[in-house]
Amino acid sequence: MSRALDKAGRWIGWAFFADLANGLALTFGYMFSRPVTMQYPDKEKWLPYSRYRGHHFLKRDDEGEIKCVACELCARICPCDCIEVVPYEDEKGNRRPAKFEIDTARCLFCGLCEDACPADAIALGQQYEFSSFSSRDLVIGRDDLLAKPGKAMTGGGVVAARLNTERDVLVEASEPRGYNWWRNIRRK
């Protein structure tokens, strides 16, 4: 019985060794190939697709008024409780938000607020750079949400990065097709 167990143990040991050798060969192959790291933000910048869920922004109607009717559905459906809406009635008798704040530090960017809005007033844009030294800077008010840019119709490409002194400017991609992230990876 011990001889049978000894043979089975040797066979299992060789199988694990073969697996280990396969893994090491793959690792060494990648170690000497070109890196896939994108040179962000120094040399190139990724433009997200139009379906990307980035920053929040509020929309205006044709007359330039805010579309939000302060129904607070976005605040109620938000799983993170990061939206605060305080309604008021304007001089025309329309319900509008006196205060509309989104805490992007707590937000999951799930898009439920966008789906729940009956007036199509809130949407998620393509901006993905939110870095800040203070968490207070990540709370975005109504006026800032109205000033944010909307969605670009193109995206999914990589463009040369350039120093842009204008804030919140969307760069249009020259190529409408997607970007092949795995172009430098060896294929078997």
Swiss-Prot record:
Annotated positions binding [4Fe-4S] cluster 1: 68, 71, 74, 117
Chief subcellular location: membrane
Membrane topology of this protein: Peripheral membrane protein
Pfam family, one: Fer4_7
Keyword Flavoprotein attached: no
Subcellular location field: Cell inner membrane
Entry's Gene Ontology cellular component terms: plasma membrane
Keyword field: 4Fe-4S, Cell inner membrane, Cell membrane, Iron, Iron-sulfur, Membrane, Metal-binding, NAD, Plasmid, Quinone, Repeat, Translocase, Ubiquinone
Entry EC number(s): 7.1.1.-
Subunit and interaction comment: NDH-1 is composed of 14 different subunits. Subunits NuoA, H, J, K, L, M, N constitute the membrane sector of the complex.
Record PANTHER family: NADH DEHYDROGENASE UBIQUINONE IRON-SULFUR PROTEIN 8, MITOCHONDRIAL (PTHR10849), NADH-QUINONE OXIDOREDUCTASE SUBUNIT I 2 (PTHR10849:SF24)
Function: NDH-1 shuttles electrons from NADH, via FMN and iron-sulfur (Fe-S) centers, to quinones in the respiratory chain. The immediate electron acceptor for the enzyme in this species is believed to be ubiquinone. Couples the redox reaction to proton translocation (for every two electrons transferred, four hydrogen ions are translocated across the cytoplasmic membrane), and thus conserves the redox energy in a proton gradient.
Name this polypeptide is given: NADH-quinone oxidoreductase subunit I 2
Name of the gene encoding the protein in the UniProt record: nuoI2
